[in-house]
Swiss-Prot record:
Cofactor: a divalent metal cation
Species of provenance: Burkholderia orbicola (strain MC0-3)
Function: Involved in the regulation of the intracellular balance of NAD and NADP, and is a key enzyme in the biosynthesis of NADP. Catalyzes specifically the phosphorylation on 2'-hydroxyl of the adenosine moiety of NAD to yield NADP.
Taxonomy of the source species: Bacteria, Pseudomonadati, Pseudomonadota, Betaproteobacteria, Burkholderiales
Location in or out of the cell: Cytoplasm
Broad enzyme group: transferase
Family to which this protein belongs: Belongs to the NAD kinase family.
GO cellular component: cytoplasm
The protein's name: NAD kinase
Sorted UniProt keywords: ATP-binding, Cytoplasm, Kinase, NAD, NADP, Nucleotide-binding, Transferase
Any single biological process term in GO: NAD metabolic process
UniProt EC number: 2.7.1.23
Record: residues binding NAD(+): D75, G76, N149, D150, R177, D179, T190, A191, Y192, A193, L194, S195, A214, Q248
Catalytic activity: NAD(+) + ATP = ADP + NADP(+) + H(+)
Length: 300
């Protein structure tokens, strides 16, 4: 049960089909339980690692019962559970099992030291925005989805360019011939949007970025919009066009379909260790100033 800001029930979520993840998850569960917290597991995680002795819950049950969810895996795992728990405002702690992640910012080697401190109430909290999107065909909505990183309209690998008509708040912006168009949150600005030459948006910036994918005209540049913008993207030309949400769910599109995107009413709380720095994450992930000293890290 959730009681104010006090943590009582902790949910554990692990990346699926990952060798070597069972042992650290089981060790983390036992250490948290020893501290007096109730520990529950996301159901698929519990089945995959074969753990017994802890309740196995659906994401909806976790949202209703847990005070915080700890995710051990990569950014993709965090994105998936974040979308599912968004309606419940369950805070997330991200532990990276592998390379440094943008949103799973705690190294697995540090989790035993940092998690008890954070569960005791010593953490930094921030809210991350999401997008909600729907596909409209012949005037009727046929599909709805949330996206933590981005909504991407693109062509299949062997078809030609697509032509897209983009409008913002009911006002025509442009027709664009390209391989596709990315609509990204600030969190998603360091994902596919970044590889398509989009700008990095700080997670606390209230914005949405539109980034063309390999546009035919070099004048089609990325643009940052206010986060209350209502974006409509219509399929004007091309074939084998798809839309995906965080690269985790995909839907085929037809000519004249429209994808409507806006900021979701939901946000996802992220919990970070005291001293967390977004700029340190950027520097390490993007290999900026790789020879920085420890003093530089502390100053950031």
């Amino acid at each position: 049960m959730k009681t104010g800001n006090q943590f009582k029930t902790v949910a554990l979520v692990g990346r699926s089909n990952t060798p070597g993840i069972a042992e650290p998850l089981a060790t983390l569960a036992d250490s948290i339980a020893t501290l007096g917290f109730e520990v529950v597991f996301e159901g698929d995680t519990a089945r995959e690692i074969g753990i017994a002795g802890y309740p196995a819950l659906t994401p909806a049950e976790i949202g209703a019962r847990a005070d915080v969810a700890i995710v051990l895996g990569g950014d993709g795992t965090m994105l998936g559970i974040g979308r599912q728990l968004a309606p419940y405002r369950t805070p997330l702690i991200g532990i990276n099992h592998g390379r440094l992640g943008f949103i799973t910012d705690i190294a697995a080697s540090d989790m035993q030291a940092l998690v008890p401190v954070m569960l005791a109430g010593k953490f930094e909290r921030e809210e991350r925005s999401l997008l909600e999107a729907r596909i409209v065909r012949d005037g009727e909505p046929i599909y709805h989805a949330l996206a933590f990183n981005d909504v991407v309209v693109n062509r299949s690998g062997f078809s030609g360019m697509v032509e897209l008509r983009a409008s913002v708040d009911g006002r025509y912006m442009y027709n664009q011939r390209s391989d596709g168009l990315i609509v990204a949150t600030p969190t998603g600005s360091t994902a596919y949007a970044l590889s398509s030459a989009g700008p990095i948006l700080h997670p606390q910036l209230a914005g949405i970025v539109l980034v063309p994918i390999a546009p035919h005209a070099l004048s089609n540049r990325p643009i940052v919009l206010p986060d209350d913008s209502k974006i409509a993207i219509q399929i004007v030309g091309g074939r084998d066009v798809n839309v995906n949400f965080d690269m985790q769910s995909f839907t085929s599109l037809e000519l004249n379909d429209t994808i409507e995107v806006r900021r979701s009413k939901h946000t996802v709380p992220f919990l970070h260790p005291i001293g967390y720095s977004y700029y340190t994450t950027l520097r390490k992930k993007l290999h900026w100033n790789e020879h920085a000293s420890n003093e530089d890290d502390k100053a950031s």
